[in-house]
Swiss-Prot record:
Taxonomy of the source species: Bacteria, Pseudomonadati, Pseudomonadota, Gammaproteobacteria, Pseudomonadales
Lineage: superkingdom: Bacteria
Example GO biological process: translation
PANTHER family xrefs: RIBOSOMAL PROTEIN S19P FAMILY MEMBER (PTHR11880), SMALL RIBOSOMAL SUBUNIT PROTEIN US19M (PTHR11880:SF8)
Protein name per the record: Small ribosomal subunit protein uS19
Annotated organism of origin: Pseudomonas aeruginosa (strain ATCC 15692 / DSM 22644 / CIP 104116 / JCM 14847 / LMG 12228 / 1C / PRS 101 / PAO1)
């Protein structure tokens, strides 16, 4: 269920401060974060945010279509390697 409009979007304060500094300095270095729960705001567009997926930081280049989504949606935590092949079918 989506968050109430009267509450507004959630973003961790430490990430918000890093984003504001990067926008102010026009810095294009990736911002490293573990906050997958934070929502993407309009002033993040154009920034690269390295989102942790449990093993490494995945770089996510934010564009206009991503606004309103959570950062964790763009860094997959599970890798699907496919089902085991049937040995009889290979022959």
């Amino acid at each position: 269920m989506p968050r109430s409009l009267k509450k507004g979007p959630f973003i961790d304060l430490h990430l918000l401060k890093k984003v504001e500094v990067a926008v102010e300095k026009n810095d294009r270095k990736p911002i490293k974060t573990w906050s997958r729960r934070s929502m993407i705001l309009p002033h993040m567009v154009g920034l690269t945010i390295a989102v942790h997926n449990g093993r490494q930081h995945v770089p996510v280049l934010v564009n206009e279509d991503m606004v309103g989504h959570k950062l964790g949606e763009f860094a997959a935590t599970r890798t699907y390697r496919g089902h085991a092949a049937d040995k009889k079918a290979k022959r």
